[in-house]
Amino acid sequence: MPAQGSQRSLLGSLNSTLMATSSLGLSANQSGPQCLEVSVPDGLFLCLGLVSLVENMLVVAAIAKNRNLHSPMYCFICCLALSDLLVSVSNVLETAVMLLLEAGALAAQATVVQQLDNIIDVLVCSSMVSSLCFLGAIAMDRYISIFYALRYHSIVTLSRAQWATAAVWAAGILSSTLFIAYYDHTAVLLCLVVFFLAMLVLMAVLYAHMLTQACQHVQGITRLHKRQHLVQQGFGLKGAATLTILLGVFLLCWGPFFLHLTLIAVCPQHPTCSCVFKNFKLFLALIICNAIVDPLIYAFRXQELRKTLKEVLLFSW
């Protein structure tokens, strides 16, 4: 479990690489560029994790409670919430254990701590990979529902959605295990970066095509109305804003972490790259922020889910 300076590793397997690049960057920065390091207090980090944990637990509870939400679309949303929940749990657990070890409130053998760190690392990596996969699955589900509306229920069945989610979880566990085992191979890091870029391109293409189709649909409906241009312009701006939010949040929250991995593979000893490495904890905080924002974008906008969520909250009281 890392406990040196402000470097807190998301993946324990990267500890040696991160500490080496940090020390090299520090010595280089004495005569090199000034580094901007954004400090994220442990208290704030824990609070973000707990907010994400509670929020995603409510999403899972609401979907499990309401049988009307047992559909392929909500299956993907529920799995996204589970992935984000695991991201939050693993990061909160790792931070809490690290603070207890530093304070001397928790005594454990080095081998036990290392085993716990490896388990947390697998949880973190698998949940991150699965979270990205389910974001792509939600985009594909919405795309099929628009462009193949009449055949949607025959194409996207609940059983197929369940098989797809099982495959995603299995792929997440397998990829995280390989990543932990071969963390020092540049190809492994680059594969993760390519995977992220593929998900980004997939979401951008699908959502942009859906926006174009929606604008054409509105154009056909409003063709006979006098205020056709104003209606089309307003809808186009709203759709563009929605697309910008979807892709902007995705890129802002996930991009810095994968930029970090890219720089580890490309320029681990460069002074400028070492400046980026110093903000690794900030990149983790952004990923947890994504876990907070995901339910607001994909889950809480549904009226049926909001209604069930109120019932869950009233029942809990």
Swiss-Prot record:
InterPro entries referenced in this protein's UniProt entry, alphabetically: GPCR_Rhodpsn (IPR000276), GPCR_Rhodpsn_7TM (IPR017452), Melcrt_ACTH_rcpt (IPR001671), MSH_rcpt (IPR000761)
- The record lists glycosylation at 15, 29
SMART domains with a match to the protein in the record:
7TM_GPCR_Srsx
Pfam families the record matches: 7tm_1
Q: Domain of life here? A: Eukaryota
Q: Report the transmembrane regions from the record.
A: 38-63, 73-93, 119-140, 164-183, 192-211, 241-266, 280-300
Entry membrane topology? Multi-pass membrane protein
Side of membrane Cytoplasmic, spans: 64-72, 141-163, 212-240, 301-317
Subcellular localization, as worded in the UniProt entry: Cell membrane
Task: Pull one GO CC term from this UniProt entry.
Answer: plasma membrane
Q: How does it assemble?
A: Interacts with MGRN1, but does not undergo MGRN1-mediated ubiquitination; this interaction competes with GNAS-binding and thus inhibits agonist-induced cAMP production. Interacts with OPN3; the interaction results in a decrease in MC1R-mediated cAMP signaling and ultimately a decrease in melanin production in melanocytes.
The protein's name: Melanocyte-stimulating hormone receptor
Q: What is the lineage of its organism?
A: Eukaryota, Metazoa, Chordata, Craniata, Vertebrata
